[in-house]
Swiss-Prot record:
Localization terms from the record: Cytoplasm; Nucleus
Coiled coil: none
UniProt xrefs under Gene3D superfamilies: Glutamine Phosphoribosylpyrophosphate, subunit 1, domain 1
Record's keyword terms, sorted: Acetylation, Cytoplasm, Hydrolase, Immunity, Nucleus, Protease, Proteasome, Threonine protease, Zymogen
Active site annotation, chain numbering: 21 (nucleophile)
Catalytic activity: Cleavage of peptide bonds with very broad specificity
Description of post-translational modifications: Autocleaved. The resulting N-terminal Thr residue of the mature subunit is responsible for the nucleophile proteolytic activity.
Protein name from the UniProt record: Proteasome subunit beta type-9
Expression triggers: Up-regulated by interferon gamma (at protein level).
One of the GO biological process terms: immune system process
UniProt xrefs under InterPro entries: Ntn_hydrolases_N (IPR029055), Pept_T1A_subB (IPR000243), Proteasome_bsu_CS (IPR016050), Proteasome_sua/b (IPR001353), Proteasome_suB-type (IPR023333)
Length: 219
């Protein structure tokens, strides 16, 4: 006998998996730093605590994922495939702007079907380090940008703390502090922090574990 309010066959609803998240990218002279938290959620459940939301598009071009996990990864995979072909045709690595345009075009073409926002950042020989936002098919280059559910908590901090001419280490610290502050406030952001530094010399990957995160007053 079923109790009142008990779930019945067919009454279960599958929650879409989201990278409710905090992502960020910062330019410096000679490269970029890209960072993200690692929490992935479905409704109120955390389904992955250490998901890497920094996806490579080419050798020195990465994107940071937010929105629906499946949609964001699908856009990244399609863009990476097109950029690989583009690089083979040109016989040289694609430009960061070209990668951002590919992501922008895919996002706009499928804007009614896909729920995702990607930040594209990287280094090329023509323009050096570059950061692009691609929300809703828009394309804009910025010295730094943030996105995801946690970003609304840190706009004041990043506007006050950013300064032109920062070193790579200062950019990493700036990114780590901003994402940590967002993780402290946003229930959909959490876990560890992934950082990627991209320069002419290559790509440097770092992971900031929970016990290594900076401490702030609210804690």
């Amino acid at each position: 006998m079923l109790r009142a309010g008990a779930p019945t066959a067919g009454s279960f609803r599958t929650e879409e998996v989201h990278t409710g998240t905090t992502i960020m990218a910062v330019e410096f002279d000679g490269g970029v730093v890209v960072g993200s938290d690692s929490r992935v959620s479905a409704g109120t459940a955390v389904v992955n605590r250490v998901f890497d939301k920094l996806s490579p598009l080419h050798q020195r071009i990465f994107c940071a994922l937010s929105g629906s996990a499946a949609d964001a990864q699908a856009i990244a995979d399609m863009a990476a495939y097109q950029l690989e072909l583009h690089g083979l045709e040109l016989e040289e690595p694609p430009l960061v702007l070209a990668a951002a345009n590919v992501v922008k075009n895919i996002s706009y073409k499928y804007r009614e079907d896909l729920l995702a926002h990607l930040i594209v950042a990287g280094w090329d020989q023509r323009e050096g380090g570059q950061v692009y936002g691609t929300m809703g098919g828009m394309l804009i280059r910025q010295p730094f940008t943030i996105s995801g559910s946690g970003s609304s908590y840190i706009y004041g901090y990043v506007d006050a703390a950013y300064k032109p001419g920062m070193t790579p280490e200062e950019c990493r610290r700036f990114t780590t502090n901003a994402i940590t502050l967002a993780m402290n406030r946003d229930g959909s952001s959490g876990g560890v922090i992934y950082l990627v530094t991209i320069t002419a010399a290559g790509v440097d990957h770092r992971v900031i574990l929970g016990d290594e995160l900076p401490k702030f007053y609210d804690e």
